[in-house]
Amino acid sequence: MTYTPDTPTVVLVHGGFADASFWVPVIRELQASNLPVLAPANPLRGLAHDAEYVASVVGQIDGPVLLVGHSYGGAVISVAGAAAANVVGLVYVAAFALDEGESFAEIFERFGATPLVDAVRPSSYPVEGGGTAVELSIAPELYQSAFAADLPSEVTEVLAVSQRPFAAIFDDRAQAAAWKTLPSTG
């Protein structure tokens, strides 16, 4: 494939309990096809903050952008896609696509708990100005069964001990739902 100015840059947004290296196989495929790709580090500090960060990354890209989100990254691209004028579409990969005003707590209440909920472990971290806040990670021994059952154990053993925790986001409400106005698939 030949890159043209109209070819969207594919921006891959990882979810919680992971980092941008999650996308390595996809990045390799896109690069092999000569497609522009970027996989920024999702800060995992809260839905509004993370979406604002991703929108700022996207806003610095010349030309159109196709946002791709996995898991929690889907919620992030839904909000970020509404804030960045150059986003031309959204792709959800086993991802959350929250409606405007919807929270993760409502999703889990509506559809029930998953093994992931029982595998999550809270811990506290210091915040600017003093005090602490809660962040979540998956118990390493439960990582594969609760979060990545479709991946080989040699991969999940590394992911389990290198996962990035994220701030408690269950009550965060989506400020936008770009999937309502942009072409979307998943």
Description of each model-found segment:
Residues G129-V134, I138-D150:
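Helix-loop "lid/cap" segments that line or gate small-molecule binding pockets
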Residues N86-G130, F166-D171, Q175:
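Flexible "cap/lid" loop of the alpha/beta hydrolase fold
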Residues S153-G186:
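Conserved serine/cysteine hydrolase catalytic core
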